[in-house]
Amino acid sequence: MSKTHLTTEKFAQMGLEPEVLAGLESKGFHYCTPIQALSLPLLVEGHDLAGQAQTGTGKTIAFLAATFNYLLTHPLSNPRLVNQPRAIIMAPTRELAVQIYNDADTISASTGLKLGLAYGGEGYDKQLAVLEQGVDILIGTTGRIIDYFKSKVIDLSNIQVVVLDEADRMFDLGFIKDIRFLFRRMPAPTERLSMLFSATLSLRVQELAYEHMNHPEHVQIEPEQMTGIRIQEELFYPSNEDKMLLLLSLMEEEWPEKAIVFANTKHVCEDVHAWLENDGHRVGLLTGDVPQKKRMKILEDFTKGTLDILVATDVAARGLHIPDVTHVFNYDLPDDAEDYVHRIGRTGRAGKSGHSISLACEDYAFNLPAIEEYIHHPIPVSKYDREALLDDVTAPKRVVRNRQPVNRNMRDRQGGGNSNNRRRPPRKS
């Protein structure tokens, strides 16, 4: 683990219970990140907290350590029913809920606290069987949690800790009514520890915090550097005609070890995926229409390196802990300026450098002013040479293209990213 993103503060100095500390140290967590060093002392003292930090800075470990610690130091005075969890952690997506559960599982063994997972799309009966045995900490998405609540599988009247992760994404996905429904079934804010974490804390998120939390402390990490000091940003202005060929040309020039390509719609994602796959890249597709089991398999393959490129909608832009992403390509500039920050935050994590390349095409260039205003700096512009764009790629059968291709053999990426037939770069010097 790189130490460049850590502080000199140790978890052992945070006042955590020995069981929690043992769980953290067993997984190699000794030094705190900035968000952990600032938030844990407040949480250990019992203060509610609304924390803002860039993705990949350790928010998850911060709220998990605080949750386990609070439950160990605040035993219930009266016996609880088997269907009454003591803590609830809400996430906007299934993938994020699963990742939080996996992180929590590394700590739970040393604490004796039981975990439950609840998310939609699959596994209802399997999840139900675990919940019926009783859990201390319930992690999940709001829709499935509400399903279990209405079926009386769970009762929230003994909740001692509540965590809302990626709160602004909850608003974006329209889950705010679900969140308020669940909050109102829990004990009053003064009777529980509440945490809200997000990469951004918009006004609407702060209003939610004041509505359902007990005078929360606010913690922010590097708010002036919205996009991360280790991310090299770059912007091109392609015509719609050149856009796909520019992406393919840049992909060949950069030859990234691990890249995510973002587009604004699933249909465009499908087209981009088809072009990249047809061009010989090991590429996966992640959109809302992909079945849950396949989504998890794609993420697993991408994480372990079986896939080099992931094409995704913003469903993958928030919260997912995918290590070692070297490049992010914004094939479409996002409509929401905050999503630009979340997208490129997939790279440049854990003290490593990253590269973000955005294409401001004819359809989405108008999103650029709002993005640059939000991040407080202009994105450096690069020019490209149309004559240097790939002209020997074969279009996928179901995609109609404007420029006539010439057939060529697909490149082989099975060797892990070595290109033996490099073309002259499309960038103008």
Curated annotation (Swiss-Prot):
Keywords: ATP-binding, Cytoplasm, Helicase, Hydrolase, Nucleotide-binding, RNA-binding. GO terms for cellular component: cytosol. It catalyses: ATP + H2O = ADP + phosphate + H(+). Pfam families: DEAD, Helicase_C. InterPro entries: DEAD/DEAH_box_helicase_dom, DEAD_box_RNA_helicase, Helicase_ATP-bd, Helicase_C-like, P-loop_NTPase, RNA-helicase_DEAD-box_CS, RNA_helicase_ATP-dep_RhlB, RNA_helicase_DEAD_Q_motif. Residues 243-390 form the Helicase C-terminal domain. Residues 395-429 are annotated as: Disordered. Residues 40-219 form the Helicase ATP-binding domain. A motif (Q motif) lies at residues 9-37. SMART domains: DEXDc, HELICc. Its EC number is 3.6.4.13. It is found in: Cytoplasm. Gene3D superfamilies: P-loop containing nucleotide triphosphate hydrolases. GO terms for molecular function: ATP binding; ATP hydrolysis activity; RNA binding; RNA helicase activity. A motif (DEAD box) lies at residues 165-168. One of its GO terms (biological process) is RNA catabolic process. ATP binds at A53, Q54, T55, G56, T57, G58, K59, T60. NCBIfam families: PRK04837.1. Belongs to the DEAD box helicase family. RhlB subfamily. Component of the RNA degradosome, which is a multiprotein complex involved in RNA processing and mRNA degradation. DEAD-box RNA helicase involved in RNA degradation. Has RNA-dependent ATPase activity and unwinds double-stranded RNA. This is ATP-dependent RNA helicase RhlB.
